[in-house]
Amino acid sequence: MAREYKIEDYRNFGIMAHIDAGKTTMTERILFYTGKNHKIGETHDGASTMDWMEQEQERGITITSAATTTFWQGRDGKKRRFNIIDTPGHVDFTIEVERSLRVLDGAIALLDANAGVEPQTETVWRQAEKYHVPRMVFVNKMDKIGADFYRSVEMVGSRLGAVALPVQLPIGAENDFVGVVDLIEMKALTWDGTIGAPATVGEIPADMADKAEEYREKLIELAVEIDEAAMEAYLEGTMPTNDELRALIRKGTIEVKFHPILCGTAFKNRGVQPLLDAVVEFLPAPTDVPAIKGIDVKTETETTRESSDEAPLSMLAFKIMNDPFVGSLTFARIYSGKLTKGVSLENTVKGKRERIGRMLQMHSNSREDIDEAFAGDIVALAGLKETTTGDTLCDPLKPVILERMEFPDPVIEIAIEPKTKADQEKMGIALNRLAAEDPSFRVKSDEESGQTIIAGMGELHLDILVDRMKREFKVEANVGAPQVAYRESITRAAEIDYTHKKQSGGSGQFARVKIIFEPHDGDDFIFESKIVGGSVPKEYIPGVQKGIESVMGAGPLAGFPMLGVKATLIDGAYHDVDSSVLAFEIASRAAFREGAQKAGAQLLEPIMKVEVVTPEDYVGDVIGDLNSRRGQISGTEGRGIATVVNAMVPLANMFGYVNSLRSMSQGRAQYTMQFDHYEPVPTAVAQEIQKKFA
């Protein structure tokens, strides 16, 4: 079977937004207008197509990014293939967003016309910057009370530091919102609001003519800056044609120089079709973005893989899901080459072979078996044994490791135990499966108490995982109170000279190390050797590093992992017979334990960036409450009729905050929080923690 759509006609994109900006409704509309969905599912009915896990439908939030393939005929009459990845907008699931962005070529950022740029929008935007993803912005919910398109455009500049390029203006707002002015064609597009109705094209309302001219002029000025020839022509008085203008906007969007801004209301069916046209016209095909980089396994040098069916096969596994009908599904993006059912591929990260048995094309919760897939496709593979998120699968003859994804460490832990003996074994299987799906979820055993500890990115994250264990794996579990994932570090430099000697008949053990331990700004561990003259032979130096790393996981104060330590090996001694890598490992372990005490060990706690959006009446109570939680208020600002309070608060003091805020504001205030940084714990609090964990 040959390729049905040219790779130039693919658009791999995602929709990213703050929770409640209308992302799931927008995806539903896109699926409806592109003909994949016959009945629109509304999020508030719990019937949405993309949100296919039970909890998502209950909670009305999107948790897992389902990938969907659909098609759209552009303005030029040509059909394009869309692969849409739905991403969650809740802070506890930023990891999902991160991995979706990693495999997308472009994205639509949705804004709520009333709230503008919200905290999660900033987080997701920053993640997209990291991967240099071309983005458009759609100002949604223009029919909502307090909708303000121009304020949202201003916030894209002031809050996101991005260059906003409005290509449409709204006609009316709130209940009077009827359509948009297309600044490229200089026509008015209006909709009567019935599902699936095309736009009525007409003249721009007289009272908007001047504004439209002014914004079109700004649009052209920004667009011609992208291309020297267009700029020269413009300065000589030649205006670009509409098609030339679209080409310039496309070029600038793909180069991430600016972001086209459109508007509408997905719920009321106004503005969806022009957005789909804009995906075709402004967002990149896989061939428009730089070729993916990787490491050639044979030569260990950097290499690239072009988006072409002729290139050697390479693909990145970006998500693992348990499907109730198919079992474990691995979602992968094919970057180069052609994939055929039945072939064996190399997992270069694990050094294992995987056979491709069953291949599926996913529509949100229905699936279609396929035998072939090509560069640019996103496929679901059933039955892979060794592959986890972030692994590369490729042609065994041309092995490559594509750029890995980075996942943050969890900030919250809870103890969990099975309710019955029968649940014991099932719980182990369930937790391992969930951890394979979600790299930001960790499972470990507490050696002293024998308890199983699960760790994640927030209370909601762990709630949902425990809930899934119950539903999908039928495991009943008792859950402890949440614990903060504290860390330890050192505050000053300390030099330790330690000798490890053991003689008990036969060959003994001997190693002497002289190490300087000092704090550094990062969170990682840095090891350096300044040995000259062979006082410690080269082959023993890795043992010194390994020894220190093996005890970094349990600091001297309360047994928490250590952060931000630099160790420099400056001297030592060895014995021809009695020294070994193991002896140096033991010596450096003991040196570190002694050094951590002498270097002024301190406890660190995670500090969360908290944003509370509250009606004016409750601002005083909210600020007072955050102060009582050891919070530092960093400022307040107006947002529509509400006030936004920004603060930095220790995670330890934020447990159960959702209920306090609800009762304080009669359910009218909302908050978001995300991990920001680690900070030393105040002495009195640190003593309490040490007592508890010592």
UniProtKB/Swiss-Prot annotation:
Function: Catalyzes the GTP-dependent ribosomal translocation step during translation elongation. During this step, the ribosome changes from the pre-translocational (PRE) to the post-translocational (POST) state as the newly formed A-site-bound peptidyl-tRNA and P-site-bound deacylated tRNA move to the P and E sites, respectively. Catalyzes the coordinated movement of the two tRNA molecules, the mRNA and conformational changes in the ribosome.
Domain of life: Bacteria
Matches recorded under Pfam families: EFG_C (PF00679), EFG_III (PF14492), EFG_IV (PF03764), GTP_EFTU (PF00009), GTP_EFTU_D2 (PF03144)
Residues annotated to bind GTP: 17-24, 86-90, 140-143
CDD domains (UniProt xref): EF-G (cd01886), EFG_III (cd16262), EFG_mtEFG1_IV (cd01434), EFG_mtEFG_C (cd03713), EFG_mtEFG_II (cd04088)
Encoding gene per record: fusA
Chief localisation class: cytoplasm
Cellular component GO terms held in the UniProt record: cytoplasm
Similarity remark: Belongs to the TRAFAC class translation factor GTPase superfamily. Classic translation factor GTPase family. EF-G/EF-2 subfamily.
Localization (cell): Cytoplasm
Domain tr-type G: 8-287
Any GO BP: ribosome disassembly
Stated name of the protein: Elongation factor G
Any one Gene Ontology molecular-function term assigned to this protein's record: guanosine tetraphosphate binding
HAMAP family associated with the record: EF_G_EF_2_B
InterPro entries given in the database record: EFG_II (IPR041095), EFG_III (IPR009022), EFG_III/V (IPR035647), EFG_IV (IPR047872), EFG_V (IPR035649), EFG_V-like (IPR000640), EFTu-like_2 (IPR004161), G_TR_CS (IPR031157)
Keywords, alphabetical: Cytoplasm, Elongation factor, GTP-binding, Nucleotide-binding, Protein biosynthesis
